[in-house]
Amino acid sequence: MTSQFKEKYTLEERQKQSLNIFNKYKDSIPIYIDFTNFSKTTEKSKFVIPNGFTIGQLLTAIRMKMSLNPASALFLFINNRLIPVTTVVSNIYESDKDYDGFLYVCCSEENTFG
């Protein structure tokens, strides 16, 4: 899946944005989230999270930002892999970040109770 962010901005523009994030927020990770299969939409797709955040904490932040129904399950995919909630995002960032400095995440919502 091609990221909307990559389609909208050139590699150089994205690199500049990630560098600005690193300069402004030391020890943080720039993430771009593509939302698919969502009943609600959000304007916020760029996130800056602390190095120690887990995937579970990122899911909680997304859920709070979008005020999702508790019956909705969220799944995060990085490079077409479902990532366990206990995984520290900085570990994934080191192996899966893009050339532009962002970690691209696909977030999918599924209604689990009907």
Regions found by a protein language model. Give the residues of each.
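Ubiquitin system architectures
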Residues: 1-114
